[in-house]
Amino acid sequence: VAKRKQKQDPNALTTKLGGKEWHIKFVRSREIPSDRWGDCGHPEDPQPTIRVRRAVEGKNRMDLIIHEALHAIYPDETEEMVNRSATEIANLLWACGYRRVEM
């Protein structure tokens, strides 16, 4: 179950991925390299972290979160497999009506 780090911070939460606790941060565009929408640390990092640009919305945000979660769970998997799988899962969830709810 994902949990917000603090009730006051809607841009951070923790969750288990691949059996490890991960920090998920929704960051400003300037906090992440301009050539990416999100990134994923390594599971062996002291505080494994996924960063997602706040500016990404809708189905693209869903795809991005799934993409980075797949990297966290399967760090040795190819980018091609992660891209394809994340997009297919996001398309399925979107078609089933899943949408982001403001907390």
PLM features per residue range, with description:
Residues 1-5, 102:
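Polybasic, lysine-enriched low-complexity intrinsically disordered terminal tails
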Residues 4-59, 72-93:
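Active-site scaffold of zinc-dependent metalloenzymes
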Residues 96-103:
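Short, positively charged interaction helices/loops
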